[in-house]
Every structure is written in structure tokens, then in C-alpha cells.
Amino acid sequence: MWKVLAWLSLFVASLGYSVWVYCASSREPSITDSETVLAGKKVFQQHNCIACHQVYGLGGYLGPDLTRLMSTPGKGSRWANAVIRTGNERMPAYDLTEADMAALLEFLSAVD
């Protein structure tokens, strides 16, 4: 009888742990839906950045994944601003307005 109770308690404990793990990991990451972030997402979509870059592992493969761009050491908003404005050997330069650039950088910070 005690073996049945031991197995039953082990089953209940593992079931409780499984439910806890599922609930803790099923929360969606929160992206701040501020007006600036939404405007930056629109700029990102209008210029078809996803054709070359990935966000959360989805998108093109020509350019780098932008998911952690803003927190990567040696990168960040100043680096992104310079690369977007001047371009490089694989990326064209974009002449964005200051407002569009600020919104795009805010969007990239939100997906960081």
C-alpha cells in the first residue's frame, strides 16, 4: 500500500511541477506598443527590412539578426543609426527622417 501512495504522490508532484513550468513559460514577451514603437514597426515594414534581417529568428539571411542588436556590446543605437544612414557593402543607405529613425531605433529596442 505504501508503494502505491509513494507513486501517487510522485505523480501528483510531477504533474504540479509540469503545470507550473507550462504556465511560467507560456507568457508572451511583452513588446511595448507605444506610438513610437508602432511607428518604428511601420518604418521597418515599409523599407522591407525583414527581407534581409531576422527578428525573433524569422526573416531573411543576408543581414544579421536584429533581435538583440541594441544590447549587443559595441553596437546599440549610435551604431545602428550610422549603419542605416551610411550603409555598407551589403546594405544600402537609407535617408530616413529624424522621426522615422528615432521610431525605428525604438522598435529595435523593443524587440531587443
Give the location of each predicted region.
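C-terminal capping alpha-helices of c-type cytochrome domains
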Residues: 2-24, 93-112
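Electrostatic cytochrome c docking/interface patches
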Residues: 22-44
